[in-house]
Design a protein with these regions (language model features):
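Surface-exposed molecular-recognition determinants
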Residues: 2-334
């Protein structure tokens, strides 16, 4: 029987308009199969990425790590499943490609991997910065988003203090002072004082960690291109409609006031809506889940959730990060 999604908003020219940019301008969700030898992976888009969130589509073992690579740290990767130091390896970034080395981390022979690649720039709502802490003295870190960030991801890189290299997540709609951790399933915790003075040009961090090196990733919603929000679930199989005002290519999701998984869904994992959904766990060692739980349709204006599970749509609040498969008419990404 053909599966026909229902209950979502109909596309009209008034809602979406005519796309002004090619879909590949700034975000790519894609898969590749490891060869065991160094090679370039085609992202399916033309732009040169600056950031890669990757997941081998198997349970994590000694050769199968989830992590983040970026253009500020060429030749290094960061594990998103654990609070561990950065390690040598990673990828190189080229126009429309990522270059993987011969190591098993991203290139295990025969293993399929998923990547979410982003381009840095004001018009894409994404920036990165490295900074040194200064003991208990707050440090002002500049960014170039052209407006206040909606979300910040940051962590320790190196230094004598040996600070816990957790992946801290700040969002403007979390309770004041509260943070999540990307490398944890825990609910948001009180991190008052760590992130303050979030503004259009800078953010103040107080890491209380000597002169250690940290890295921050800044995200800002761009109309028609990306969205970073917190919304309530309805605990109903006829779930909420996440109105992004664009057709999503990738969505990252986490309950904020409940212990629960970070989950990522994308059009690379499921090119079409169907009665099951492939879901990966960026911060857990589990293999991808394929089934009717976490079911959600990617539609013209957003995501229609069709599940009442606590991970995606219980009676809790959820951080939702979405990037467009097709940017809408009002995107700045031109």
């Amino acid at each position: 029987m053909e599966y026909k999604p229902s209950g979502f908003e109909v596309t009209t020219n008034q809602l979406q308009g005519s796309p002004e940019v090619w879909p590949g301008d700034g975000i790519a969700a894609f898969k590749w199969v490891g060869t065991g030898v160094a090679h370039d992976v085609d992202t399916g888009k033309d732009f040169q990425p600056d950031f890669l969130l990757y997941n081998p589509l198997v349970a994590q073992g000694a050769d199968y790590y989830r992590g983040i690579c970026d253009s500020l740290r060429p030749g290094y990767w960061l594990n998103t499943c654990a609070a561990t130091a950065q390690a040598a390896g990673g990828v190189t970034f080229g126009p429309g490609t990522i270059g993987v080395d011969a190591s098993n981390m991203l290139n295990h022979l025969g293993t399929t991997c998923h990547g979410l690649a982003l381009k840095r720039g004001r018009k894409y709502g994404f920036d990165m910065a490295q900074f040194n802490s200064n003991g208990s003295t707050p440090v002002v870190v500049n960014h170039d988003l052209g407006g206040s960030p909606d979300m910040i991801l940051f962590r320790w890189l190196s230094g004598a203090s040996g600070a816990a290299p957790d992946w801290y997540v700040w969002h403007k709609d979390l309770a004041s002072g509260y943070l999540l951790k990307l490398n944890s399933t825990a609910a948001a915790f009180d991190g008052t004082g760590i992130v303050t003075n979030v503004g259009a040009a800078s953010v103040t961090f107080n890491m209380a960690a000597g002169t250690d090196l940290f890295q921050a990733y800044f995200f800002k919603s761009i109309p028609g291109f990306s969205k970073f929000l917190i919304r309530a679930g309805n605990a109903n199989a006829d779930g909420v409609f996440d109105n992004f005002r664009f057709n999503p290519g990738a969505v990252l999701n986490k309950a904020t006031n409940l212990t629960g998984s970070w989950i990522l869904q994308s059009t690379a994992l499921d090119p079409q809506n169907k009665a099951t959904k492939t879901t990966i766990y960026p911060s857990q060692v589990d293999a991808p889940y394929t089934g009717a739980t976490y079911l959600a349709d990617f539609v013209a204006q957003g995501r229609k959730v069709r599940d009442a599970s606590n991970v995606i749509n219980g009676a809790y609040n959820y951080l939702v990060c979405a990037w467009a498969k097709q940017p809408g008419a009002y995107s700045n990404a031109v």
